[in-house]
């Protein structure tokens, strides 16, 4: 219903903070529940069983809050984390740009120093919660070097020079609004920088490892719901006086769906454990797990 009516369930999302879901892997010292990536994947998968779009939206908020906690200084953490943990404010992650996708080394949004502010110019694309959320953890270019010139800033929705495009028209996930984020001489305090200048590329890469796991988990949850609905339907629908669940061809299809789902789940859980343990091959496994989970999920849903 939320998807069909394009309803953004902000109250429901905020209520999830009572379960700690506003700060799943934010440290306990910062008010989070400090779970690992495997536990987070289990939570995202379970929520996606009910609504993949809402689960994915909450996962993005968690990525943004985690970046501030993991890499921000004491001042920026004290200023933003309490409201993010309680979800009084909801956060987005702004990396993707027109023409460069999520290639952090190729982004073109610039930030130049002007006194105690950065002045931002550029456009971010496909930003979840764009125009609805309060806080945007944003990757910008402060230097010429491809990867060493990327810096991370916390941008607030109402800062001067920040605007948003119209909501994107999508085939699904319409309970999660998506829009461009536009900077026209936007002024952001230097105090809103997360970590040191030029360190943003490393933060972005670490964030994408967790993001891939969460999107894969959302796909698993949605696919499991579709499989369960399909099994129930085959037991109810009859042909020639027999439930179609008794037909061997139907059983073959359901078995293939279940097998692909369990294979994707096993790889995703393995990748999540590797990210939690900071294994040297964590990025490879998180990318593989996301690819398999989303492709298998689409197949099962179709």
Over which residues does each language-model region extend?
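Alpha-helical interface subdomain recognition
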Residues: 1-55, 59, 71-76, 83-88, ...
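A short, Trp-centered hydrophobic/proline-enriched beta-strand micro-motif
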Residues: 87-95
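Flexible, small-/acidic-enriched active-site or ligand-binding loops
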Residues: 106-108, 158-189
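A short core secondary-structure module
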Residues: 117, 121-164
